[in-house]
Amino acid sequence: QRQQWLREAVSQALAGPGAAHAELQRCLRVLAGPCPGEAAPERGLGDTGGHEGALAELAELCESLDNATDFCSLGGLEVVLELLGHRWPPLRAGAARLLGSCAQNLPEAQARALALGALPALLGVLRGDPDPRVPPAALFAISCLVRAQPEGLQQLEALGGLEVLGGALQSPHPPLRARAAFLLHCLLKEHPRLKAPLVQQGLVPRAAALLRSEHDGAHEHGLGTLCR
């Protein structure tokens, strides 16, 4: 229901000519401003509603390649990367989802995000964010930066990202396990040469342990990694 409401709101906001550009600018102005009560440690998560809404709307808008290109030209990636380190989990998760939405299928956005250091930041979130909502969003963004993107894959390998992906297979959180298994399956399918380093880093016992766990969405892709 929330997704349907968001799509309807975006459609209404984009009814006129040039409306998408104006809406991108409006949302970025929201994100550039401080969250209400940001200095108060006791502040509840609900106070970030304006920023969360702006991130969600931007992610919806940036599913259009034209809007994603415009978003990058407005400096949106720089704003989003700062929010990856925000103290409140919904903003970190929303920033990661927006980054993935913008980079998906847009080489220019991928290259810009990689040049800005998005991948090490996302891997840091994937390694150690304490909130279970955030790592799956980070993994989505990582996938959008490394699949069919040679520079992104090169960075992933250099940063030890393959080991991080393998470790995510052992997460206690099913959504993260499923995303990690899917990405590893895709990478092995697209780049068979990755089999050797992944096996060396313990992929086989990790994938086997995944298959022995309670059945969930990760099993099919976990089996796929073993069959590669």
Can you describe what each PLM-predicted range is?
Residues Q1-P41:
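Intrinsically disordered, low-complexity regulatory regions
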Residues Q1-W5, A39-A59, W88-A103, A115-L116, ...:
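Alpha-helical solenoid repeats of the armadillo/HEAT superfamily
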Residues R7, H21-L28, H51, L119, ...:
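A general structural signal for well-ordered alpha-helical segments in protein cores
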